[in-house]
Curated annotation (Swiss-Prot):
Belongs to the metallo-dependent hydrolases superfamily. HutI family. It comes from Thermoplasma acidophilum (strain ATCC 25905 / DSM 1728 / JCM 9062 / NBRC 15155 / AMRC-C165). Binds 1 zinc or iron ion per subunit. It is an enzyme of class 3 (hydrolase). This is Imidazolonepropionase. 4-imidazolone-5-propanoate binds at R80, Y143, H175, E238. Catalyzes the hydrolytic cleavage of the carbon-nitrogen bond in imidazolone-5-propanoate to yield N-formimidoyl-L-glutamate. It is the third step in the universal histidine degradation pathway. Its EC number is 3.5.2.7. InterPro entries: Amidohydro-rel, HutI, Metal-dep_hydrolase_composite, Metal_Hydrolase. GO terms for biological process: L-histidine catabolic process to glutamate and formamide; L-histidine catabolic process to glutamate and formate.
């Protein structure tokens, strides 16, 4: 047994399911307690550490649950640096896509890479996320286009899931329709790939938006995946509102992701479907779009998660930066974003029984931060405040100096 000691504060949501509405802001705070860890799980939150227990001095910092990143495109090869400058000069996302670049560029790079290269580039990014406090990550396919390419990405994800440092949730993503290919025929093909790999994936996802799949094709794909017993997610309303949410009425979709452009009727359907919303504020930052108002979603009783959406478009794996943007621009408070980065995404990924909160019996997935209080986390977004990342009781990253970041004299 070991104990995390000298913690000024432990802050966590509670429970084994989504927190929504007013409860999304419920955070339990322990002052000057220790966390006992045994067998990779949280044994107890206590004031008194038993004798003979290995003590890990946390330097007066704050412990929160390990961050759960529920939406990533981290598995790919290559980069899109030229597109970054094109967007800065005013070229739109859709114009880049229609020219055969954007997602199509990454598809070409990834299809031409072998599995080992995809693995090496991806695991490097995973370790970067670990240093920023992430202990669980959803990873999508989507850059392979055909069965062979998607299975190559999925194999790289599986290696990371089985041998890597963090918990991984594989998702099959129907990303875009190949140029000069008929949409209905392509959907038939990808459904065969999903069927062939249904034991290897935890979720099925589709990008329903301008320049991607139509609402009709998206519903067909989602219905088929659900019929196979695969839970469904959806990318939607990122570029435009083309009616994707309305087309999903009655489907048990776990999470509607992006949701930049929505109306009240869309939120009614999300609520009726018993679904959640995952906001991706770093992507909005990268696209220089207007941020959606999370208050409209939370106040309807819909649970909200946040994610990094790390991808070649958005090379950022920092959940703390996502929390900062969600407070600053999506109008969430410190308590809501803490739960949006921990328990709610854990519930979104079907892991809330064992992850997402600091409670006895759950996995010891923890982040120790050089702060005095959890509400400083979004505020200190630009500083190196992650002092320790722990996954299932194993210390994955330790900065060594666990001292408090002092901003009191500024």
């Amino acid at each position: 047994m070991r104990a995390l000691t000298n913690l000024s504060q432990i802050a966590t949501g509670e429970g084994r399911s989504f927190l929504s509405g007013e409860r999304q802001a419920d955070v339990k705070v322990y002052e000057n307690h220790s966390i006992l860890i045994h067998g990779g799980r949280i044994a107890e939150i206590t004031r008194a550490v038993p004798p003979g227990v290995e003590e890990i001095d946390c330097g007066g910092g704050v412990a929160v649950p390990g961050f759960v990143d529920p939406h990533t495109h981290i598995a790919f090869a290559g980069n899109r640096v030229q597109e970054f400058y094109m967007r800065i000069r005013g070229t739109s996302y859709l114009d880049i896509l229609r020219s055969g670049n954007g997602i199509y560029r990454t598809i070409r790079d990834t299809v031409n890479a072998d599995e080992n290269r995809i693995f090496k580039e991806t695991i490097s990014r995973v370790w970067s996320a670990v240093r920023r406090g992430t202990t669980t990550m959803e990873m999508k396919t989507g850059y392979g286009l055909d069965q062979r390419g998607e299975e190559k990405i999925l194999s790289a994800i599986e290696v990371i899931k089985n041998t890597g440092p963090i918990s991984v949730v594989p998702t099959y993503l129907a990303h875009v329709v190949p140029q000069d290919v008929q949409e209905n025929a392509y959907v038939e093909g990808i459904l065969e790939t999903v069927k062939r790999n249904r034991q290897r994936i935890s979720y099925a996802d589709i990008f329903c938006d301008a320049g991607a799949f139509s609402p009709e094709a998206s519903r067909r794909f989602l219905e088929a995946a659900i019929a196979m017993g695969i839970p469904a997610r959806i990318h939607t309303n990122e570029i435009e509102n083309v009616g994707c949410v309305k087309k999903t009425r009655g489907l048990p979709i776990v999470s509607y992701d992006h949701m930049i452009h929505f109306d009240d009727a869309d939120l009614d359907i999300v609520k009726e479907n018993g679904s959640s919303v995952t906001l991706l504020p770093i992507t909005v930052f990268a696209l220089n779009e207007a941020y959606p108002d999370a208050r409209r979603i939370i106040d309807r009783g819909i649970p909200v998660s946040i994610a990094t959406d790390i991808s070649p478009l958005n090379m950022n794996d920092d959940m703390i930066f996502a929390m900062h943007l969600a407070v600053r621009n999506n109008h969430m408070n410190a308590e809501e974003v803490l739960n949006a980065a921990t328990i709610n995404p854990a519930a979104s990924l079907g892991l809330a029984e064992k992850k997402g909160t600091i409670e006895s019996g759950k996995d010891a997935d923890l982040v120790v931060l050089s702060a005095r209080s959890y509400d400083e986390i979004p505020y200190l977004y630009g500083l190196d405040i992650v002092s320790m990342t722990i996954s299932r009781g194993n210390i994955l990253y330790s900065r060594g100096d666990h001292g408090i970041t002092d901003t009191s004299e500024a």
